[in-house]
Amino acid sequence: ATDATPEEVRALFKNSRIIGRRFRLVHIRFGRDIIEVATFRAHDEDSPKTELDRHGRILRDNTFGEIEEDAMRRDFTVNALYYDIHDYSVLDYVGGLKDIEARQLRLIGDAATRYQEDPVRMLRAVRFAAKLDFSIEASAASAIYEYGHLLAVIPPARMFDEMIKLFHSGKAVRVFELLREYQLLKHLVPALDEWLQEDPNESMLDFIDQALVNTDDRVNTGQSVSPGFIFAILLWPVVQQQATRMQPDRQKMIGALAQVGETVMKRQVRHVSIPRRFSQMARDIWTSQPRFHRTQGKQPLRLLAYPVFRAAYDFMCIQ
């Protein structure tokens, strides 16, 4: 972060570009890396450079200010620390160091206002709490129940990005627990939340837990996890239940899984905009499951040649 405006930063670095409309930033290329540079911001609702919607959500915030003002615009105290490269000191204007010692996630300012400004802060609270093994301070935690519904105004494309951050954090098991605890799952995967409210069978809950354990293991060892696999996990209880009701005959299950999978996914993308390559992968994983029971003739060889065979096989093994 700097007191230089985006235009001033852009003028200093030829290998840079200004990005963003809501929050203008500068991306500076440094070899293969991109360094993101933000200008200190100030709070000024009356400025023409600050725009709010009817819910109080910040649509645009490009009112620049001083470092002390910028600290107050950050979401959490632990995320408002500044490293001074001149004397190697840490500048703390909001008590962030004390909260780190207490392993506590505290919002800066009034919780209701901060969540209304950007409802995604509730998801960030869950992600940071899970990733850092911190508790969420009482007022910040209680406000999540009241303002969780504001996630409905967030564009589905942004919700997809946040979902991936949550479940690719290496702490997906804890993330899932916190999303359920704070009643946020219904805004991300409503079909799964409804299934959980009914009377979910323990074996399927064990499946979700083990699948997320495996996901965390892969992330923490530097291996990739496709978003398609994540959504296949989270929606499988719903898809399997509805497909079984539609077609009890396991020999005819593939068609039922395909039909139900399409319906469930169509509903899901209204909340979280899943790119087609990932939604199709999830559906292919589901329809592959009955094929593992077909061992006659050339059917196993056909399954081996399936594009999602490896992911589908891992999925089957977890079950």
Task: Please name every model-derived segment.
Residues 1-319:
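Catalytic cores of the polymerase beta-like nucleotidyltransferase superfamily
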